[in-house]
Amino acid sequence: MSKAFLPTILEQKEKEVAQLVMEDLQPLRQTYRLYDFLKSNQNKLQIISEVKKASPSMGDINLDVDIVAQAKTYEENGAAMISVLTDEVFFKGDISYLKEISTQVAIPTLAKDFIIDEKQIVRSRNAGATVILLIVAALPEARLKELYDFATSLGLEVLVETHNLPELEVAHRIGAEIIGVNNRNLVTFETDINTSLELSTHFKDKPVYISESAIFTGQDAALVAPYFNGILVGTALMTADNVAKKVKELQIDKG
C-alpha cells in the first residue's frame, strides 16, 4: 500500500467524477433518522455494520459474500445502519450493491465512498442511501461545507469523518450532527484505537459520535463504549464465522 493512500484515491475519484452525469433526483428512501435513533438509544453501543468485499489494507476480504443476505443478518440482529462500499477500484464495491441492499432492508444505509462532488451525492441518494460520508481530510473546509449543505438540503444525513483534533474542530465548525472518528490514518493506513479515546475528550453535547476501524472484538468495543454512540465495523463482520453472534458481541450494554 502506498504511503500516499488518500491522494491516490482522490486522484482516481477526480477521474470518475469527470465521467459522471448529474442524475435527475429520485424520491428519498424512507427510514428513520440515524441521528435521532442514536440520540434516543444510548443504552447500547449501536452498530453500523459494513458490507465490504475488499480493502487496500486487507486485500480481498470476502469476495463471494451474498451481500443482501449479509445485510439482512445485520438488520435482524439489531444494526442501526448498514454501510455499503460503493468504491469499485480500491474496495471492490459497486453502486449497484447499495441499490440491491436498500430495497431489501428498512434501516438507514450509508453510501461509503470518497465523495468530492455533488454528482456523487445525487447518485448515492438515488441508489437508496439515506446517509453519505464526507471525509474532512479529503476536502478543503469551504468545499466540505458546500457538500454538507447540499446533501442535507436533499434530505440526506451526513457522517463527517475525522482523524485528529484539527479535523474534529472542522466537523464542529460546519455544524456536523453525526461525526466519525476513524482510528485508521488515511495516509499511512495504520490503525490505533487510542485515536478515538484521545479525541473523545473534545466532544460536544449536540453531535453523536461514531468510532470507526480497528474494532474487532467485544473488548475493543467496550473500550470506546463509554464515549461513543456507535461504532462502524466492517472487516470483523465480513470475516466472522457467525455474523449474528459477532454483531451481538459488539453491542455493548451501556446501562
Curated annotation (Swiss-Prot):
Quote the catalytic activity from the record. 1-(2-carboxyphenylamino)-1-deoxy-D-ribulose 5-phosphate + H(+) = (1S,2R)-1-C-(indol-3-yl)glycerol 3-phosphate + CO2 + H2O
Q: Which GO terms describe its biological process?
A: L-tryptophan biosynthetic process
Return the InterPro entries for the record.
Answer: Aldolase_TIM, Indole-3-glycerol_P_synth, Indole-3-glycerol_P_synth_dom, Indole-3-GlycerolPSynthase_CS, RibuloseP-bd_barrel
- Quote the protein name from its UniProt record: Indole-3-glycerol phosphate synthase
Q: Read off the NCBIfam families from this record.
A: PRK00278.1-3 (NF001371), PRK00278.2-4 (NF001377)
Per the UniProt record, which EC number(s) apply here? 4.1.1.48
**Which PROSITE patterns does its entry note?**
IGPS
- Return the Gene3D superfamilies for the record: Aldolase class I (3.20.20.70)
Pathway assignment: Amino-acid biosynthesis; L-tryptophan biosynthesis; L-tryptophan from chorismate: step 4/5
Query: Which organism is this protein's natural source?
Result: Streptococcus thermophilus (strain ATCC BAA-491 / LMD-9)
UniProt keyword terms in alphabetical order? Amino-acid biosynthesis, Aromatic amino acid biosynthesis, Decarboxylase, Lyase, Tryptophan biosynthesis
Q: Which Pfam families match?
A: IGPS (PF00218)
Task: State the similarity comment.
Answer: Belongs to the TrpC family.
Supply one GO molecular-function term: indole-3-glycerol-phosphate synthase activity
